[in-house]
Curated annotation (Swiss-Prot):
Keywords: Chlorophyll, Chlorophyll biosynthesis, Chromophore, Magnesium, Membrane, Metal-binding, Oxidoreductase, Photosynthesis, Thylakoid, Transmembrane, Transmembrane helix. A chlorophyll binds at residues 162, 242. It comes from Synechococcus sp. (strain ATCC 29403 / PCC 7335). The record marks 234 as: Stabilizes free radical intermediate. Synthesizes chlorophyll f or chlorophyllide f (Chl f, 2-formyl chlorophyll a), probably by oxidation of chlorophyll a or chlorophyllide a and reduction of plastoquinone. The reaction is probably light-dependent. Chl f absorbs far red light (FRL, 707 nm in 100% methanol), and is synthesized when cells are grown in FRL, where it provides the advantage of extending the spectral range of harvested light in terrestrial cyanobacteria. Chl f synthesis is probably light-dependent. Due to differences in the C-terminus this protein cannot bind the oxygen-evolving Mn4-Ca-O5 cluster bound by 'normal' PsbA, however it probably still binds plastoquinone and chlorophyll. Belongs to the reaction center PufL/M/PsbA/D family. It is a multi-pass membrane protein. Disruption phenotype: No synthesis of chlorophyll f when grown in FRL (705-735 nm, 26-30 umol photons/m(2)/s). The record marks 205 as: Tyrosine radical intermediate. One of its GO terms (cellular component) is photosystem II. PANTHER family: PHOTOSYSTEM II D2 PROTEIN (PTHR33149:SF12), PHOTOSYSTEM II PROTEIN D1 (PTHR33149). This is Light-dependent chlorophyll f synthase. It is found in: Cellular thylakoid membrane.
Length: 419
């Protein structure tokens, strides 16, 4: 295997060689086929695999998988990510187009989500697995027939599980590519934020609620329906973890807009290319193009301090980009933790605001009352039994449904003038 920059060799060679710092790739210089590091690596690879010795099919396959010369890097984790994500995508498209109605509640009430059943692109969704299945692993071979598997919502579980495996493998593939190119693994670390959010919503929450029927429908309107139902059940808007997630996402978007506008406003004009005298590792001097600044970091910081306040500055561009990456990643992590806690009905971290306050003996509703009324309304809409409507078109309600009956003795006591 080709020698890496960390002093390791692959299992194809069976031995290790010490790492030569002279072969390390300079990340600041463009990666071209004429670089000395690439030439050394190629020369070493030719020494390890002489042209006269034919390579076995397995060795050629391993070199093709781990080669960074491919147009798209495959990698060993890509061998797992590509088929799982492709399976999830194909089944999702087929289910959106032609999946039959699903017994989502396990009571015989069918819910349709496909386009052929009358839904449009907004209302179409992959309906979650039936509540009768619960958390059981429900592959195709566990059902008596394909029709039974479709009616019980088997495609939803297939899509979700393959998708989760695929995105985790994709994140590990990013780490693998960074390792091959001798880069730091922060790209893979940043991608853990959407992975954590997806796992929390699609896997952890159904597990905590006792069935995949509580999962998010895979569609546009299904996503918003899940959000409103989640708010009604757990009041996630009052969770500090969710609020930190909102701060991270919106704050990260604000910082990206500020950074992009400052950089665009301070871009330097392209100067004439100047040459600088540099000394190579062999001790000889050579002319090398001198790097020119892309934008003026000092002018951007001066503008920012003048516009906001004197302390609003960063010491270097590295600190700027670290904040741009760390703020949204930390926010999404905290929101995912909030969903995980809500999945197991652990709502003690949520803020409990008073339902009302009294000012001069006047009841003043708070925003908490508005949220509570919205939650109750969503609960009412989600009830399984629809209300009965009268001839006038208004729903009919019985007083006994909302007020407990009063006993005769209690009623006579309340109406007695001597009480």
């Amino acid at each position: 295997m080709i020698q890496t920059g960390f002093g390791r060799t692959s299992a194809l060679e069976g031995f290790e060689q010490p790492f030569d710092p002279a072969q390390a790739i300079d990340l600041e210089s463009p990666l071209t086929s004429t670089d000395t590091s690439v030439e050394n690596t190629t020369r070493n690879a030719g020494a390890l695999w002489p042209s006269s010795q034919p390579l076995s099919p397995w060795e050629r396959f391993c070199r093709w998988v781990t080669s960074t010369e491919n147009r798209i890097y495959i990698g060993w984790f890509g061998m797992l990510a590509i088929p799982t994500l492709a399976t999830a995508a194909i089944v999702f498209v087929l289910a959106i187009i032609a999946a039959p109605a699903v017994d989502m509640d396990g009571t015989g009430r069918m819910v349709s989500g496909s386009l052929l059943d009358g839904n449009n692109l907004i209302t179409a969704a992959v309906v979650p697995t039936s509540a009768a299945i619960g958390l059981h692993f429900y592959p195709i071979w566990e059902a008596a027939s394909l029709d039974e598997w479709l009616i019980n919502g088997g495609p939803y579980q297939l899509i979700v599980l393959h998708f989760i495996i695929g995105i985790i493998s994709y994140q590990d593939r990013e780490w693998e590519l960074s390792y091959r190119l001798k880069m730091r693994p922060w790209i893979s670390l940043a991608f853990t934020a959407p992975v954590a959010a997806s796992v929390s919503v699609l896997l952890v929450y159904p597990v905590g609620q006792g069935g995949f029927a509580s999962g998010m429908p895979l569609g546009i309107s299904g996503t918003f329906t899940f959000m409103m139902q989640f708010q009604a059940d757990h009041n996630i808007l009052a969770s500090p973890l969710h609020q930190m997630g909102v701060i991270g996402v919106l704050g990260g978007a604000l910082l990206c807009a500020v950074h992009g506008s400052l950089v665009t406003s301070t871009v330097c004009r392209a100067p004439a290319q100047t040459m600088a005298l540099t000394t190579t590792k062999t001790g000889t001097d050579r002319q090398k193009p001198k790097k020119a600044k892309t934008y003026s970091f000092e002018h951007a910081q001066a503008y920012q301090q003048t516009l906001l306040w004197r302390g609003a500055k960063f010491n270097s561009s590295r600190a700027v980009h670290f904040c741009l990456a760390a703020l949204p990643v930390a926010g999404i992590w905290s929101a995912a933790i909030g969903v995980d806690l809500a999945a197991f009905d652990f709502d003690r971290l949520s803020f409990e605001l008073p339902s009302h306050i009294s000012v001069r003996k006047t009841v003043v509703p708070t925003w908490s009352d508005v949220v509570n009324q919205a939650n109750l309304g969503i609960h009412t809409v989600g009830e399984k039994t629809p209300p009965k409507f009268s001839e006038s078109g208004f729903p009919e309600f019985k007083l006994s449904e909302f007020v407990e009956p009063i006993a005769e003795d209690s009623a006579s006591t309340l109406l007695s003038p001597h009480s």
